[in-house]
Swiss-Prot record:
Oxidoreductase is among the record's keywords: yes
Function: Catalyzes the NAD(P)-dependent oxidation of 4-(phosphooxy)-L-threonine (HTP) into 2-amino-3-oxo-4-(phosphooxy)butyric acid which spontaneously decarboxylates to form 3-amino-2-oxopropyl phosphate (AHAP).
Pfam families per UniProt: PdxA (PF04166)
Record organism: Mesorhizobium japonicum (strain LMG 29417 / CECT 9101 / MAFF 303099)
Identification of the protein by name: 4-hydroxythreonine-4-phosphate dehydrogenase
EC number: 1.1.1.262
Domain of life of the native organism: Bacteria
């Protein structure tokens, strides 16, 4: 059982990126920003080395998940990994891949065992992982694999970008724009919307979520004159969702979907492709947008940026998005717990 004293698990990400230093910076700002307790899954020597490079003093205590919340007020709790890292900021090394993956594995296991209220992931880079034999497209797909392996639940992970004023969900994600019309199906839209509505209700505490469904084509196709996908694929999905009692409406023209008055009318916007979802989310909340993975049997958030190898180790990386991810993970965990007890 996840109690109020159960800390969040934070995986360190690629140690050559900014993950270690934004974790340090977030911890040092914990009192000023009201940060919930977390423990870092990492190599303690890496964190000490990075703090030294940055010229900052951070107290570190090696601990267990059960004791992390008690430690957090006085020191950065680190649950040590078996792997050891090479501290090479800005220079990714496949030798660090095993530890990067171990941190993710242990965060998932902690969530499923009740040893973490939720997991937050610092950014990873695909190439050093691929060079070491990792064969998953990215974080999200690997998390779905782990969820199935640990719990027997086949998960369909759904990506959400959540900011203070907007939540967006891309139905198709990391594929070329030219491939989107072929990948987009009524069934995929319906499945994505169902998961979004369920998590908005269960974890975000929104009793009757309102889903705005964006059209694929300019002006949502203008009745078929600018493409048939909105009439033949998107609109049938909306009809199915409404028949199921989900408050979905659309297809809506994307060019007028994200201004303030429009945003007041929905709780999340389902977008048909990656940039349709991420451009408005990052424009409105570049520093504090959070990536939330819906549809998993545990809560996972992450900062909405990458490893930033170009600035790693220079002391200029901002922890804002990680702080937002930690806070949102705590909120979602608390809401999920209340919903489960109701």
């Amino acid at each position: 059982m996840k109690s109020a004293m159960t800390a969040l698990a934070l995986s360190v990400g690629d140690p050559s990126g900014i993950g270690p230093e934004i974790a340090i910076a977030a911890f040092l700002a914990r009192e000023a920003v009201g940060l919930p307790a977390f423990y870092l899954l990492a190599d303690p020597a890496l964190i000490a080395s990075r703090a030294s490079r940055l010229g900052v003093s951070v107290p570190i205590v090696e601990t267990t998940p059960a004791l992390a919340a008690q430690v957090f007020a006085r020191a950065l709790p680190i649950v040590p990994l078996a792997a050891r890292f090479i501290d090479s900021p800005g220079r990714p090394d496949p030798a660090n891949a095993a530890g990067t993956v171990e941190a993710i594995d242990r965060a998932v296991a902690a969530c499923l065992a009740g040893d973490a209220a939720a997991m937050v992931t610092c950014p990873i880079a695909k190439k050093p992982l691929y060079d070491a034999g990792f064969r998953f497209p990215g974080h999200t797909e690997y998390l779905a694999h782990l969820a199935a392996r640990h719990s027997g639940v086949e998960a369909m992970p759904v990506m959400m970008l959540a900011g203070p004023d907007l939540r967006t969900v891309p139905v198709t994600i990391h594929i070329a724009l030219a491939e989107v019309p072929k990948a987009l199906t009524t069934e995929l839209i319906v499945a994505t919307a169902r998961i979004t509505a369920a998590d908005l209700a269960g974890r975000f505490g929104i009793a009757r979520p309102r889903l705005a469904i964006a059209g694929l084509n300019p002006h949502a196709g203008e009745g078929g004159s600018l493409g048939l996908e909105d009439e033949h694929i998107v609109r049938p999905a909306v009809d199915i969702l409404r028949a199921e009692g989900i408050d979905a409406f659309g297809p809506l023209a994307a060019d007028t979907l994200f201004h303030a008055r429009a945003r007041a009318g929905y709780d999340a916007a389902l977008c048909m492709y990656h940039d349709q979802a991420l451009i408005p989310a990052k424009t409105l909340a570049f520093d504090d947008a959070v990536n939330v993975t819906l549809g998993l049997p545990f809560i996972r958030t992450s900062p909405d940026h990458g490893t930033a190898f170009d600035i790693a180790g220079k002391g200029i990386a901002r922890p804002d998005s990680l702080i937002a991810a930690l806070k949102l993970a705590r909120t979602l965990a608390d809401t999920d717990k209340k919903a489960a007890a109701a």
